[in-house]
């Protein structure tokens, strides 16, 4: 991926992008996905198998919307940690959580997906939503998520993917490559962040390759579910 100046790394570039759009991120996600993002997050959370009283981790949690879904499953006796490296996204996440019944069971932590600040076998599950494209090292991120999950627990990724259905694929890529950057520019008031979105998907591995990465990092029963015609894919693996 081309990193524009003055940024020196993908990590620095991604941090700047999400800092600039945190205030409009949730609204634009819902608008650009035609309100499907809520269903996608709920489906991904359900794949974790998180039970009432359980403990979950949401990596690259952003504004906390998937974190909230995990807290809903964990219930009043559970605990969920949302981790992100972007301060402004975490601030928005705290604001979002304060409007839910789950503020007492969610904690936000600033940290990096490739070096999670938790001991081995800490959580019952770990999720990452719409962020595996953005990390500097996909394999390391999956490996870190697996490390902090207890044996038998699930690692789940919800991510944009590459649809393959004829005709639908062409329509989708026209929308994604041309209209999303335009609508994003109108939504945030400046160019850049939503032009990054289609570029990030071009460089991202196909869903079958991500499944293989899950296997190579030691996750058992690695599988994936394509949703909404393959616009997004949920990958699931079990820690052994």
In which residue ranges do the predicted regions lie?
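A short acidic, Gly/Pro-enriched loop at the edge of an enzyme's catalytic core
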Residues: 114-125
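Core SAM-dependent methyltransferase catalytic element
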Residues: 217-240
């Amino acid at each position: 991926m081309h990193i524009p100046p003055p940024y020196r790394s993908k990590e620095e570039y991604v941090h700047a992008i999400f800092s600039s759009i945190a205030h409009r991120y949730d609204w634009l996600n819902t608008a650009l996905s035609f309100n499907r993002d809520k269903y996608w997050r709920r489906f991904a959370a359900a794949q974790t198998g998180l039970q009432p009283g359980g403990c979950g981790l949401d990596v690259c949690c952003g504004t906390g919307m998937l974190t909230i879904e995990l807290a809903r499953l964990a219930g009043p006796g559970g605990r969920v940690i949302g981790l992100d490296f972007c301060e402004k996204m975490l601030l928005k996440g705290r604001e979002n959580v304060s409007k839910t019944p789950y503020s007492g069971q969610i904690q936000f932590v600033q940290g990096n997906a490739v070096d999670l600040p938790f001991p081995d076998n800490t959580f019952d599950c770990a999720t990452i939503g719409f962020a595996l494209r953005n990390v500097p090292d996909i394999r390391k991120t999956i490996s870190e998520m697996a490390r902090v999950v207890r044996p038998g627990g699930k690692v789940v990724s919800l991510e944009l993917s590459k649809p393959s259905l004829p005709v639908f694929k062409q329509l989708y890529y026209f929308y994604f490559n041309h209209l999303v950057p335009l609508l994003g520019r109108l939504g945030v008031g400046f160019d850049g962040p939503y032009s990054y979105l289609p570029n990030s998907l071009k460089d991202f591995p196909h869903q079958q390759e991500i499944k293989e990465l899950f296997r190579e990092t030691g996750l058992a029963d690695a599988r994936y579910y394509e949703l909404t015609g393959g616009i997004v894919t949920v990958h699931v693996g079990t820690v052994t």
